[in-house]
Amino acid sequence: MKIHLNGEPHNAEAGTTLEGLLMGLGFAPEKVAVERNKAVVSRGTYGAVVLQEDDQIEVVHFIGGGQHPPADSWSVAGLTFNSRLLVGTGKYKDFEETKIAIEASGAEIVTVAVRRVNVSNPNAPMLTDYIDPKKYTYLPNTAGCFTAEDAVRTLRLAREAGGWDLVKLEVLSDEKYLWPNNPETLKAAEILVQEGFKVMVYTTDDPHMCKRFEDLGCVAVMPLAAPIGSGLGVRNPYTTRIIVEQAKVPVLVDAGVGTASDAAIAMELGCDGVLMNTAIAGAKDPILMAHAMKHAVLAGRQAYLAGRIQKKLYATASSPLDGTFF
């Protein structure tokens, strides 16, 4: 038997009811409205209405008005992500808290350090038992490395362990300030790029250095906002803005974020994303802070896209003065 369903020819078995048609299509009868031959059919009678040859059936439901906004995704090394918040996996009280916080943050990329296994307890829990590498993009880093040699060794092992080519390179100058050692970082970056690694590089908020790393072949530059773990926020928005304007690769603020407003400021400057660890893991309530950071990054990004008003010395009335009665 042939009927017309939403303007298109449709075959139905003889004796099929409206309810049977809807269920066969996968629609819950209580979520739609049906018109048969231009007459609305009462929902309570769907099971009793038997379809006839050439019936004209319209099935409708509610949708939101307007168009869905386009996804504001970003890409690095050929991979596309929706979340612009990247998070670390250290400093949490246990792996369970790590898992819950990452889920709350909405992050898709998580940084992981490479460390020796516990040979005395091979059954000890590992991060991969809680954070699924198939669900999240692991970003191996070189945290704790102070020489180019150590950084390169670390990432070679990371690639062997998980097959990861996308990596975060950081080479530090000292243990007190954890400031980037740019000469050693450059040396390591050159080797890693030649070996096929896709390097996201942690560096100072220096436009010249960021440009050098980009020219070397790094797929993203990650200037610090402030020293690692300091929570001081974006200390030099001027140079961060210059880095964003000149870069042809993603720019992500890395290190120094302390609270949600810091993340929002970084995004308002036009950064493609923000990476943080201590700001979430070190909070009194890491799970709640993870939620806050998720919304802060989104708010900052939307504010950047919307375009802030110009800063001015004098006031401008928001209500028109024309038509006042005094």
UniProtKB/Swiss-Prot annotation:
UniProt catalytic activity: [ThiS sulfur-carrier protein]-C-terminal-Gly-aminoethanethioate + 2-iminoacetate + 1-deoxy-D-xylulose 5-phosphate = [ThiS sulfur-carrier protein]-C-terminal Gly-Gly + 2-[(2R,5Z)-2-carboxy-4-methylthiazol-5(2H)-ylidene]ethyl phosphate + 2 H2O + H(+)
Any idea which GO molecular function terms this record carries?
A: thiazole synthase activity
Alphabetically sorted, this entry's keywords are: Cytoplasm, Schiff base, Thiamine biosynthesis, Transferase
Keyword Iron-sulfur annotated: no
Annotated residues that bind 1-deoxy-D-xylulose 5-phosphate are located at G229, A255, G256, N277, T278
Its annotated compartments are: Cytoplasm
Name the domain of life this protein comes from. Bacteria
Q: What SUPFAM superfamilies does the database record attribute to this sequence? A: MoaD/ThiS, ThiG-like
Indicate whether Cytoplasm appears among the record's keywords: yes
Report the active site residues: K168 (schiff-base intermediate with dxp)
> Which Pfam family, giving just one, matches this sequence?
ThiS
* GO BP terms: thiamine diphosphate biosynthetic process
Outline what the protein does.
Catalyzes the rearrangement of 1-deoxy-D-xylulose 5-phosphate (DXP) to produce the thiazole phosphate moiety of thiamine. Sulfur is provided by the thiocarboxylate moiety of the carrier protein ThiS. In vitro, sulfur can be provided by H(2)S.
What family, per the record? Belongs to the ThiG family.
Q: How does it assemble?
A: Homotetramer. Forms heterodimers with either ThiH or ThiS.
Q: What is this protein called?
A: Thiazole synthase
Species of origin: Magnetococcus marinus (strain ATCC BAA-1437 / JCM 17883 / MC-1)
> Gene for this protein?
thiG
